[in-house]
């Protein structure tokens, strides 16, 4: 199994756009995995070793619940978490904002680099924004894709439906692994 724990890769060295100076790109250790969860963009790191969709976020907690449900059926599954944009897009007040089209486009090469190492059986888009920008490209590369609601949407607007969300998401993802 290929594993690239080195920070010496094109993603960590990226400086294609201005948001690369906000903080070092947020990526997990690159390794072959069955499932790749793909969020919108990195968040501000609270710890140096923090990973994308960290469990100290509400989104990360829900992704962990989905992973655990999937592992109940197949304890050999490997999951990988990433974002469409690896750096943190900040507004002029230092608050996180949605990435713009140029920032997304600039990060496509990084995503392709990741996909070539991770080689997932399925890429799980977290929300319609990720799907809108990446579905065509990722399918052209030969990967299966599925879109689920972004976990933060569920956590904020449908909190009473978390168990249903976890169950339906894991059921739909399991069709590909």
Model-found features: residue ranges?
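A charged, well-structured terminal subsegment
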Residues: 173-177
């Amino acid at each position: 199994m290929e594993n690239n724990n080195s920070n010496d890769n094109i993603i960590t060295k990226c400086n294609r756009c201005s948001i690369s100076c906000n903080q070092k790109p947020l990526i997990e250790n690159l390794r072959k995995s069955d499932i790749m969860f793909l969020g919108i963009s990195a968040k501000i790191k609270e710890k140096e070793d923090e990973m994308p969709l960290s469990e100290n976020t509400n989104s990360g907690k829900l992704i962990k619940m989905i992973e655990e449900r999937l592992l109940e059926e197949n304890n050999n599954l490997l999951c990988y978490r990433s974002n469409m944009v690896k750096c943190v897009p900040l507004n002029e007040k230092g608050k996180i904002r949605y990435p713009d089209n140029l920032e997304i486009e600039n990060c496509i090469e990084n995503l392709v680099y990741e996909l070539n190492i991770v080689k997932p059986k399925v890429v799980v888009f977290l929300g319609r924004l990720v799907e809108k920008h990446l579905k065509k490209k990722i399918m052209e590369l030969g990967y299966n894709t599925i879109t689920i609601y972004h976990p933060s949407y569920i956590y904020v607007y449908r909190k009473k439906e978390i168990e249903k969300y976890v169950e339906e998401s894991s059921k739909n993802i399991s069709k590909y692994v």
